[in-house]
UniProtKB/Swiss-Prot annotation:
Top-level division of the source organism's lineage: Archaea
Family in the record: Belongs to the universal ribosomal protein uL10 family.
Name assigned to this protein: Large ribosomal subunit protein uL10
Organism per entry: Methanococcus vannielii (strain ATCC 35089 / DSM 1224 / JCM 13029 / OCM 148 / SB)
One GO cellular component term noted in the UniProt record for this chain: cytosolic large ribosomal subunit
Biased composition (Basic and acidic residues): 311-326
Region (Disordered) residue spans: 305-336
Keyword terms, alphabetized: Ribonucleoprotein, Ribosomal protein, RNA-binding, rRNA-binding
Subunit structure: Part of the 50S ribosomal subunit. Forms part of the ribosomal stalk which helps the ribosome interact with GTP-bound translation factors. Forms a heptameric L10(L12)2(L12)2(L12)2 complex, where L10 forms an elongated spine to which the L12 dimers bind in a sequential fashion.
HAMAP family in the cross-refs: Ribosomal_uL10_arch
Pfam families: Ribosomal_L10, RL10P_insert
Length: 336
């Protein structure tokens, strides 16, 4: 905290700035420190417009941000919050929001945009210039292209590039001349935006390597974990709000199966037990000779044979219908 003795040595605007930063730091649950040193003014304004309704961005000097963070940590009795200053680096700024750290990180990543590379910068990837017309009339630019090793000539009244050319490999230092040429060609090999240094939420500080996740892979793992937990709950008979219905249904089906197999008649299983006994009786009767059967059994065997004969064509018809339905569907599948 800025005491009275030191107050006269500090510029009033700095005291006001620290107080404003402290109020901002106390205003939200999620606090992020970001690096915006390499962001050109045009791109920065575009980013501000994109994130305006989702978070608050405040730029300040690193020394003032450090002081504000430390004072808030002291005033709130939260030493973990003070550790956020360990992530101050380069041209830092503060972002406060109610978004969770992962959503915040994703939003900031999506707000990034391509930009020209500057002379002296390191190539983030192989930079290739494609063949074709530049759309520019003959002039000094032709010499500039050749000076950086790009094969160029006049073609149909315009400067054209003869062939594809890799002008820089990943990790190369870009010369000022090459940077000018790439910018003139509209080649933007770098992505600029707000880079997360650290995000604080409820005593935990997240860094970008933790926040950068593959969403599809993460959701797949989450679904698998849920399925495994669900199956464990059902099989171990540990009821939860999500599994109680399945557990009860499984218990009912198991009890019903035991009742039918053991011929233990209940209100729910009487029909199944009698049906099973009748089917077994018919099966045994079919094995016996006609002389061992009375007229009633012969009639039942005959009836069961007729029913089986009638059901067989129906089953075949259903199979054919399914095949016919599947054929157009398969054909449509080839269109996508």
């Amino acid at each position: 905290m800025i005491d009275a003795k030191s107050e006269h040595k500090i510029a009033p605007w700095k005291i006001e700035e620290v107080n404003a930063l402290k109020e901002l730091l106390k205003s939200a649950n999620v606090i992020a420190l970001i690096d915006m040193m390499e962001v050109p003014a045009v791109q920065l304004q575009e980013i501000r417009d994109k994130i305006r309704d989702q978070m608050t961005l405040k730029m300040s000097r690193n020394t003032l941000i450090k002081r504000a963070v430390e004072e808030v940590a002291e005033e709130t009795g939260n030493p973990e919050f003070a550790k956020l200053v360990d992530y101050l680096d380069k041209g830092a700024a503060i972002v406060v929001t109610e978004m969770n750290p992962f959503k915040l990180f994703k939003t900031l990543e999506e707000s990034k945009s391509p930009a020209p590379i500057k002379g002296g910068a390191i190539a983030p990837c192989d930079i290739e210039v494609k063949s074709g017309s530049t759309g520019m009339p003959p002039g000094p630019f032709l010499s500039e292209l050749k000076a950086v090793g790009i094969p160029a000539a006049i073609d149909k009244g315009k400067i054209g590039i003869k062939e594809d050319k890799v002008v820089a490999k990943e990790g190369d230092v870009i010369s000022p001349k090459l940077a000018v040429v790439l910018s003139a060609l509209g080649i933007k090999p770098v992505t600029v935006g707000l880079n997360v240094l650290g995000v604080y939420e409820e005593g935990v500080i997240y860094t970008s390597d933790v926040l950068r996740i593959d969403e599809e892979e993460f959701l797949g793992k989450l679904q698998k974990a849920y399925t495994n937990a669900f199956n464990l709950s059902v099989n171990a008979v540990i009821p939860t709000s999500a599994t109680i219905e399945t557990i009860v249904q499984k218990a009912f089906n198991d009890a019903k199966a035991v009742s039918v197999e053991s011929a233990f008649i209940t209100e729910k299983t009487a029909d199944a037990i009698l049906g099973k006994a009748h089917a077994q009786m018919i099966a045994v009767a079919k094995l016996a000779g006609d002389e061992a059967l009375d007229d009633d059994l012969k009639e039942q065997i005959s009836s069961s044979a007729v029913v089986a004969t009638e059901e067989a064509p129906k089953a075949e018809t259903k199979k054919e219908e399914k095949k016919e339905e599947a054929a157009p569907a398969a054909g449509l599948g080839l269109l996508f």
